[in-house]
Amino acid sequence: MIYLASSAMSEIVMFVAVLLIAAFVAGILTTSTYKISLNINKKGDALATKLSQDFEIINDPGDIVRNSSAGTIALYIKNTGKDPIIFTNDSFTVIIDGSIVEINTTNQLTSPGSNILSPGDVGEIVVNYNETGYHRIKVISECGISRIIRGYIS
């Protein structure tokens, strides 16, 4: 009789141990799934922002105008996205032939004085660059969207 009672008791202890382990594993899986879903939401929001903000470089690739006395060139940016784009010297980066060049000024041409490019608006980025010839120009926005133009600087 004692043998039967100890056998039943050990089975109960094992059963409780298995239940505790199963609850622990379920808790870990629930927490992991929650963290994954939060990260997916963050990535989705970032991607939605990136997709709703877009721009194009609208310079004529055959003749990118250079101001030789000031040592600058002008790049024209059009907001082709659905959302406004902040348009300041710090909100864009310009790379010419692999080298980052300094932005001299940004000018909102559609609504002068504004620091926002609304959808359809055109802005001018004036960069310090005084070399002629064919060049590869890359403009990158603060949210990571980049556009490239290969053109002749006259």
From Swiss-Prot:
Query: What are its GO cellular component terms?
Result: archaeal-type flagellum; plasma membrane
Q: Name one GO biological process term.
A: archaeal or bacterial-type flagellum-dependent cell motility
- A Pfam family matched by this chain, by name? Arch_flagellin
* Keyword terms of this UniProt record: Archaeal flagellum, Cell membrane, Membrane, Transmembrane, Transmembrane helix
Q: Does the keyword Cell membrane apply?
A: yes
Source organism superkingdom: Archaea
Q: Which GO terms describe its molecular function?
A: structural molecule activity
State the membrane topology: Single-pass membrane protein
Signal peptide start and end residues = none
Q: Does the keyword Transmembrane apply?
A: yes
Location comes to: Cell membrane; Archaeal flagellum
For this protein, the parts annotated as crossing the membrane are 9-29
The family line of this record is: Belongs to the archaeal FlaG family.
Q: Tell me what this protein is called.
A: Putative flagella-related protein G
Q: Which organism is it from?
A: Methanocaldococcus jannaschii (strain ATCC 43067 / DSM 2661 / JAL-1 / JCM 10045 / NBRC 100440) (Methanococcus jannaschii)
| Gene label | flaG
